Amino acid sequence: MYAENYKRLEQLIDKLREFNGVILVEGMRDEVALRKLGVETEIIKLSRFPLAEIALTASHYHDIMILTDFDRKGEDLAKKLTQYLEGYKCRVDTNTRRELKKIAKKDIKGIEDLYGLYLRFKSLRF
């Protein structure tokens, strides 16, 4: 089970590293975790501006990935952002978040813990 999750997590991290759009996260710690994983693309933090303003800024990118936390607040933010962005006819990836949640739901609560989970899985040496 852990070996499968680790392999899938590595695939998703590779996807994040190769992503050429903008990633929307809740806060600074989320961005730091993604940077530690080698993600170099543009990242916008939701905690800085109203959602409508963030959606407008993000709509200038061709591809947008929403990576909010896995709690109720994160779910609500992801839904609202998706609605705003679909109004701008943007291509929005919420599947990556859903996949990460499926793999890590018992181990972490959100994106800021992703780097730690990756290190734990890696240390198990499958």
From Swiss-Prot:
Q: Which Pfam families match?
A: Toprim (PF01751)
User: Per its UniProt record, what PROSITE patterns does this chain match?
Assistant: TOPRIM
Q: What cofactor does this one take? A: Mg(2+)
Matching InterPro entries:
TOPRIM_dom, TOPRIM_RNase_M5-like, UPF0292
Q: Where is Mg(2+) 2 annotated to bind?
A: D69, D71
Keyword presence, rRNA processing: no
The record's section on SUPFAM superfamilies has: Toprim domain (SSF110455)
Q: How is the cofactor bound?
A: Binds two Mg(2+) per subunit.
Q: Say yes or no: keyword Transmembrane helix present.
A: no
Q: Which family does it belong to?
A: Belongs to the UPF0292 family.
Protein name (record): UPF0292 protein TSIB_0423
Instruction: Record the organism.
Output: Thermococcus sibiricus (strain DSM 12597 / MM 739)
